[in-house]
């Protein structure tokens, strides 16, 4: 069976990796704020850049998360979303609660370990993607700015880029109306 894969950020990287490793299993791709080649050089969010560049054992990161989690979550979310009004107390509380779940930090820490696999294994082959591909990008993305999405669009032959105004790295949350419309229209073609 084949599936249309939809992924945001690292999830878009997984979707691209799946399309390259098992093209026969993929029918279409929807990449939302997708993972580019040269992630460390392309990321502009100071918090995410710091997380990628700071090696720390997971026990230390877990302790830091326990101690400073709420402040860290708010800082990261302010860099990720365009409209800070979305960061209501309820959203921050829920995000912090999710971040405090036991065992959440070690899997997040594996990003540093798996980034070389992405860069050396899949990122160098993005131009080989042959599936119909929709790229959705927030015009105000501060994790990977719009020119990164435009470059991804040029690299994946035949792809379509949809720019979402007044949205950052999570346009499906910030502008679900425009994001969902673009995805549904693409998947129904």
For the regions a protein language model found, what residue spans apply to each?
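Catalytic active-site module of serine/aspartate enzymes centered on a nucleophile-bearing elbow/loop
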Residues: 158-189
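Alpha/beta-hydrolase fold nucleophile elbow
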Residues: 1-9
